[in-house]
Amino acid sequence: MTNFEKIIAQNRLKTNAVLTTYCAIFAFIGLLVDAIRINANDLGIALFKLMTFQIFPTITIVMFVVAFVIILVCIQNFSSIMLSGDEYKLIDPSKVLSSKENQIHRLLLELLEEAKLHFEPKLYIINAPYMNAFASGWDESNSLIALTSALIERLDRDELKAVIAHELSHIRHNDIRLTMCVGILSNIMLLVANFSVYFFMGNRKNSGANLARMILWVLQIILPFLTLLLQMYLSRTREYMADSGAAFLMHDNKPMIRALQKISNDYTNNDYKEIDKNSTRSAAYLFNAEMFSTHPSIKNRIQSLRKRVI
């Protein structure tokens, strides 16, 4: 197994651990609300009966169904949401392209051949003064890669290819799907925890129901921080994987390092907060300058890239 493959395997284990934690918390919240709904006398016994379907866990099932429906809706509209608010252009190889558009398309084809992939993401150019890029799509069949015009103008050929390789790696690793699911689960968990503190709480006099209420009250306080930490950890792990994937496809870590340095310097020297207001795609960006970012620091990403044995 190569160094790259080991990194991917390790990060997949970490990802699975975080996803398992998310699902466990999600189910636990639903079961607590169900315990309150049935006015449980003993919380432990009630949870066991709900988990073994001796008592039907109505709220828990409804939560999972709602999550599933929202995910389906997002699958149909996610790409348009990610591109919203900007002037953008599809690079359509069946039409006449500019020299720069031709170059970008050729770079993508080279990477697809190198990775032995049999799908071609749609390529978009976003007319924007900031340097950034992102990938979107539920799976390979509806995937896209978007690059800002400033990024295309200021990076050299190898740096641009490395950025496309980074975004292509996100698609290969199913990162967009993962980010979407985690975000939806987080929001539903927070909503249910918050509302359940005020609903189902009427005259619940049994000790089990009151204990469930108390646990939900505590979760209402700590869940925002817990989900933020889990999302940051998960997303940062995926960024390291995508950086490694770019270096692997390029057979060189230097172009990705140079691209990250240039993008970081651009955000250091300019304030783009009022220009780029699409918060939905902040977690999907190649670079995120916020303090509590879903991305690792540029310094850590470069250090990690320099350790890669290509």
UniProtKB/Swiss-Prot annotation:
The keyword Nuclease does not apply. The chain crosses the membrane at residues 16-36, 55-75, 182-202, 214-234. Its cofactor is Zn(2+). Keywords: Cell inner membrane, Cell membrane, Hydrolase, Membrane, Metal-binding, Metalloprotease, Protease, Transmembrane, Transmembrane helix, Zinc. Binds 1 zinc ion per subunit. The active site is at 167. Its EC number is 3.4.24.-. It holds the Pfam family Peptidase_M48. It is a multi-pass membrane protein. GO terms for biological process: proteolysis. GO terms for cellular component: plasma membrane. It is an enzyme of class 3 (hydrolase). It comes from the Bacteria. The keyword NADP does not apply. Zn(2+) binds at residues 166, 170, 239. InterPro entries: HtpX_protease, Pept_M48_protease_HtpX, Peptidase_M48. One of its GO terms (molecular function) is metalloendopeptidase activity. PANTHER family: PROTEASE HTPX. Belongs to the peptidase M48B family. This is Protease HtpX homolog. The gene is htpX.
